[in-house]
């Protein structure tokens, strides 16, 4: 069964064809990073206009790469939230138009669930129950997954998401956008010598990174930071220490079979290394290309929703504030 996935929740226009939820036949992405880097962040109106220019060519390319026609597509999986409203609308309307014209079933996919399904697109299929650490620019969640479509939120950020914290730290240090990769690169040539705080929030699986960001800002303003690379390495280590420790503790408490990593920040080299080395449980870490926004994960998630009987009508709306448990 072939599923066409479409993703346009932020600044990547993507389309993919995935077979049986696990086999990627194509995965095309049109990135807007070079455009938004001029502004130091994503400009919603610019993003939606770029999606309009890219959406149909990207879908066409994905079908051609997969050597698949629309008559072979069993369903269209489309991200309908969370994300930027203007960006989501472009992808959703394109999916609706194709679905209506070709009478193809439509399946709405939660973008956060899609990230988790990166772990079904390589290697060994995950076992339930599993704990997923989903870390991105807008979310930092610990999600217990007891089966397909069964999500329980165990921990979340109380302020800045990990990716958002990296972006803010990069701006403080004068590094480029996007901040996560910039911090990661700078850290390669630095040492974690700064004593930055970690917010553990005893008795909770929640996260908090705003205090860490403020501490870095104060050190920079006081002139105590002499090396940008050392500051980047110190900040990165503080974030990763908290993510890894709280994830492992949560996994042990809920007696899961394995840990899954997902989201854009899952591409961080130190996080990938530390989580795999420190966990006594098996850890599933997606390839770099499946961590950032893409449509293959949307198609995979959509497949499992579709075979369980889930479908959506042409009246489906975008849900910019959708949560992982919605």
From Swiss-Prot:
Binding-site list for Fe cation: 111, 115, 293
Matching InterPro entries: ATPase_NBD, Gcp-like_dom, KAE1/TsaD, TsaD
Top-level enzyme category: transferase
Entry annotated with the keyword 4Fe-4S: no
CDD domains the record matches: ASKHA_NBD_TsaD_bac
Keyword Transport included in the entry's annotation: no
Protein name listed in UniProt: tRNA N6-adenosine threonylcarbamoyltransferase
């Amino acid at each position: 069964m072939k599923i066409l996935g479409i993703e346009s929740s932020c600044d990547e226009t993507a389309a993919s064809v995935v077979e049986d939820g696990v086999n990627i036949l194509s995965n095309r992405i049109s990135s807007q990073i070079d455009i938004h880097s001029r502004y130091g962040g994503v400009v919603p109106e610019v993003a939606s206009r770029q999606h309009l220019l890219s959406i149909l060519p990207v879908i066409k390319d994905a079908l051609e790469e997969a050597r698949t026609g629309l008559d072979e597509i069993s369903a269209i999986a489309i991200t309908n939230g969370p994300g930027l409203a203007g960006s989501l609308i472009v992808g959703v309307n394109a999916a609706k138009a194709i679905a209506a014209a070709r009478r193809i079933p439509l399946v709405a996919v939660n973008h956060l669930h899609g990230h988790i399904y990166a772990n079904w697109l390589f290697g060994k299929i995950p076992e339930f129950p599993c704990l997923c650490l989903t870390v991105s620019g807008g979310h930092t969640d610990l999600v217990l997954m007891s089966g397909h479509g069964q999500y329980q939120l165990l921990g979340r950020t109380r302020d800045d998401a990990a990716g958002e914290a990296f972006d803010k730290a990069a701006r403080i240090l004068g590094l480029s956008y996007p901040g996560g990769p910039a911090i990661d690169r700078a850290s390669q040539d630095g040492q974690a010598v700064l004593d930055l705080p970690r917010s553990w929030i005893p008795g909770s699986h929640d996260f908090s990174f705003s205090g860490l960001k403020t501490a870095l800002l104060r050190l920079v303003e006081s002139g105590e930071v002499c090396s940008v690379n050392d500051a980047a390495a110190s900040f990165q280590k503080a974030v990763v220490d908290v993510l890894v420790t709280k994830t492992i503790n949560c996994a042990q408490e809920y007696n899961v079979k394995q840990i899954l990593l997902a989201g854009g920040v899952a591409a961080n080299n130190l996080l990938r290394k530390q989580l795999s080395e420190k966990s006594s449980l098996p850890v599933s870490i997606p390839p770099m290309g499946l961590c950032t926004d893409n449509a293959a994960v949307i198609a995979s998630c959509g497949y499992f929703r579709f075979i369980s009987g889930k479908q959506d009508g042409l009246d489906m709306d975008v849900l910019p504030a959708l949560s992982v448990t919605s």
